[in-house]
Structure formats: structure tokens, C-alpha cells
Amino acid sequence: FFNLALATLNPGDEAIIPAPYWVSYPDMVLVAEGKPVIIETGAETRFKITPEQLENAITERTRLFVINSPSNPSGMAYTLEELQAIGEVLKKHPNIMIATDDMYEPILWTGKPFCNILNATPELYD
């Protein structure tokens, strides 16, 4: 993620980071002279960002969206349907790059196959 932020963010560009998040994500954005936009989540959404939260956070300066599933530190994992709904929002904003952090795929214990946002919404690949 660090190299991606350095390569793609210009001063003042925004990176949307759902909370809770890996501790260094915002700092990496700051080193790249970007602005971290933290979206708070809670127990009511099982610590997952909703499509509505994402849509409301997007501005003309948004260039990067970080999604980590299974998440560190919460351990939650997005479902295929949740990722498809988030993907529908992102399809409307082709200038936003997606950083999908799949580091914890091996500890997915839901009994369902692993799925990331690009598996759920392949149109986002380009």
C-alpha cells in the first residue's frame, strides 16, 4: 500500500480508509502528501463500511479507497453481496483506485470461499 500511495497520490488527494484499520494506513497516505479520510464503522455494521458511507465520503479529491478483508484488527470479512454493493458505488467513480489488502485471506474461517472486491465486481479491474 505504501508504494501505491507514493505512486498515485498528489498533494491533497484523498484516500478513504474504513475504521478500524491497520495502524499505518493513514501515515502512509500522509507521507505521500495525501489526506486520509477515515470512515468510522461500528458494531451495528459489524465494523464494515456501508455503500452509503462510502458514497457520502467520496469527493472530487478522492483518488484511493482501501479495503481490508478479512480485516486487521477486527477480523471481520465482507460477504460477496456486501462487496458487490460497494463495487456498485465505485463503478460510478472511475478515477478512484482500489487498494484491496487481502493479506489475511488464509485466516478466513467463514466456511465460504474467499472473495475480494475485484472478484465481486470484476468491472473494477481496469
Model-derived features with residue positions:
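Conserved coil-to-alpha-helix start sites within the AMP-binding
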Residues: 1, 21-25
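Phosphate-binding glycine-rich loop
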Residues: 1-14
